Amino acid sequence: MTDVRDPDISDSPPQSMEALGFADQFLVWSVRVWAQSNNPDGTAPSHYYKLMREAFAKAGLKDTHLVFDRFMSLFTIALKRPLVFHAPNCSCLSRQELFSVRLVANAQNDMLPCALGNLETYIAATGVRPTMNALMEFSQDFAREGILLEQVPDLEGPENKFRPGALRGDMANVTVH
């Protein structure tokens, strides 16, 4: 049997930030900065908000940081599973960071049933609709500015398996390391 797959397309997930394209890196960095602003590290949260606001503006997304903040807030308030995000300058990738790339890519590519199903895996049913609305709004803003995310495979392995988590209404389910 002849292998007709494109040799430039990998079935394996990216293992580091460097393996991602710019749009994917920008989203992962944004998620990390947002998470860091909500997990005290001795730096004032306003520092991270300012950093994100400036980065979004430079990318042509002047007010999108507000919609992104709304999405992340709604998403984390309705969490039913713990999340792990790396520090903004870390080269590693977590399963949840790749999930965020796939989620936005699904929204940008009109794969809404897939995006909806993925959201339902992570958040309580009561949070799905408002979170999906915010996701659609900021992912369309990204697309209008040419920030198009790629479909990336999921990470596998025991270190990335979910731990059972109770529904939480705070940032206790979000870890930055």
Q: Language-model features: where?
A:
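Polar/charged low-complexity regulatory segments
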Residues: 1-101, 105, 109-177
